[in-house]
From Swiss-Prot:
<comment type="function">
    <text>Catalyzes the reversible formation of acyl-phosphate (acyl-PO(4)) from acyl-[acyl-carrier-protein] (acyl-ACP). This enzyme utilizes acyl-ACP as fatty acyl donor, but not acyl-CoA.</text>
</comment>
<keyword id="KW-0963">Cytoplasm</keyword>
<protein>
    <recommendedName>
        <fullName>Phosphate acyltransferase</fullName>
        <ecNumber>2.3.1.274</ecNumber>
    </recommendedName>
</protein>
<dbReference type="GO" id="GO:0006633">
    <property type="term" value="P:fatty acid biosynthetic process"/>
</dbReference>
<feature type="region of interest" description="Disordered">
    <location>
        <begin position="334"/>
        <end position="368"/>
    </location>
</feature>
<keyword id="KW-0444">Lipid biosynthesis</keyword>
<keyword id="KW-0808">Transferase</keyword>
<keyword id="KW-0594">Phospholipid biosynthesis</keyword>
<dbReference type="InterPro" id="IPR003664">
    <property type="entry name" value="FA_synthesis"/>
</dbReference>
<comment type="subunit">
    <text>Homodimer. Probably interacts with PlsY.</text>
</comment>
<keyword id="KW-1208">Phospholipid metabolism</keyword>
<dbReference type="GO" id="GO:0005737">
    <property type="term" value="C:cytoplasm"/>
</dbReference>
<dbReference type="InterPro" id="IPR012281">
    <property type="entry name" value="Phospholipid_synth_PlsX-like"/>
</dbReference>
<comment type="pathway">
    <text>Lipid metabolism; phospholipid metabolism.</text>
</comment>
<dbReference type="GO" id="GO:0008654">
    <property type="term" value="P:phospholipid biosynthetic process"/>
</dbReference>
<keyword id="KW-0443">Lipid metabolism</keyword>
<dbReference type="Pfam" id="PF02504">
    <property type="entry name" value="FA_synthesis"/>
</dbReference>
Length: 368
């Protein structure tokens, strides 16, 4: 099976100087992959020449005349830059010429343009950003990580359904456990939105563990953690900052004297394993779930190594049939979502699904 991916080469802080080398490295190590490199043709070809990859058969350059800047407002990306590398890359997915799109571009713009071009799956009001965070036994899938700053209870229920389908597809788990991120495990904790979301989750057919706290994220307490995009993005950035700080402290302490430098040499195998386990770059690449096409969002600041991992996320999603499984799961569970709302309503709250959905493009930050 050939996996066809589009790469938004102009997105992110570094553009083709990062995205093209990452694509070249990935193509050379994955003979069953075909990559469409979308962007300013001269800039892409200059990088390919530099890497001596002009004739690599797995790579095809697709011209696009415009770039969505990291600080461009959503309306500019959506209405004015119709020939941007982001838009052209997404159009190739819509037209069936590629199976997934990978971009390090402006988060708000990518979400808005993706939703406009690809549309959402049946039963989904808002797409969400999902990514894997490490735990001692593997990883925990967490969503939303920045697409929706403000959420209604039914959105958190839909995120849980999507997280369930994603982990089931990637890990083969029939009933992955779901946790709702809160300030305490007790049912009475949290704001009204969280309490109502908890009622919906308890009334659903999902394997709902209950409320989880921030320290559960890296324990592996549950398979999927659900939260709104504001909380999720703060948690993600905090964890990355902590990992970087720990690495810097260890490097600084081992470099203090000749003795500590000798100790560092002796401890090098352990240090390298530690560095690999806390290196956030290998977890780069978050899926925009809920769309009628696969979209992977890379960090805007990612280097070539990190962006290559984002490409791998898209590749793995295609190989595992994530989109098809997600669409099937949402279609099958659409009725159960409504039933959960009715059950929760009977428990004392009006059904939030009957309410007016909030503004869909809550996330307007320039970088994820």
């Amino acid at each position: 099976m050939t996996v066809k991916l589009t790469i938004d080469c102009m997105g992110g802080d570094h553009g083709p100087s990062v995205t093209v080398p990452a694509a070249v490295n990935f193509a050379r190590s994955h003979p069953d992959a075909q990559l469409l490199l979308v962007g300013i043709e001269s800039a892409i070809r200059a990088q390919l020449k530099k890497l001596k990859a002009q004739d690599l058969p797995a790579l095809t350059v697709v011209p696009a005349s415009e770039i969505v800047a990291m600080d461009d407002p959503v309306e500019v990306a959506l209405r004015k830059k119709k020939d941007s590398s982001m838009r052209v890359a997404l159009n190739r997915v819509k037209e069936g010429e590629a199976q997934a799109c990978i971009s390090a571009g402006n988060t708000g713009a990518l979400m808005a343009v993706s939703r406009y071009v690809l549309k959402t799956l049946s039963g989904i009001e808002r797409p969400a950003i999902a990514s894997a965070l490490p735990n001692p036994n593997g990883y925990t899938m967490m969503l939303d990580l920045g697409a929706n700053v403000d959420c209604e209870p039914q959105h958190l229920l839909q995120f849980a359904e999507m997280g369930h389908a994603l982990v089931s597809a990637l890990e083969g788990k029939e009933r992955p456990t779901i946790g709702l991120l809160n300030i305490g495990e007790e049912v009475i904790k949290g704001n009204d939105t969280i309490k109502r979301a908890g009622e919906l989750l308890r009334a659903s057919t999902l394997n709902f563990h209950g409320n989880v706290e921030g320290n559960d994220i890296f324990k592996g307490t549950v398979d999927v953690i659900v939260c709104d995009g504001f909380v999720g993005n703060v948690a993600l950035k905090t964890s990355e900052g902590l990992a970087q700080m720990l690495s810097n402290i260890i490097k600084e302490e081992f470099g203090r004297s000749l003795l500590t430098k000798v100790m560092a040499v002796l401890a090098l195998p352990v240090l390298m394993r530690f560095k690999k386990r806390v290196d956030h770059r290998q977890y780069n690449g978050a899926a925009l779930l809920g769309l009628r096409g696969l979209v992977i969002k890379s960090h805007g600041s990612a280097d070539a190594y990190g962006f290559e991992w984002a490409i791998k996320r898209g590749y793995d999603a295609v190989k595992n049939g994530v989109l098809e499984r997600l669409a099937r799961a949402m279609e099958e569970n659409e009725g159960s979502l409504e039933q959960a709302a009715r059950d929760a309503s009977g428990a004392g709250h009006a059904s939030p699904i009957a309410g007016q959905p909030a503004e869909p493009y809550a996330a307007q930050s320039s970088k994820a």
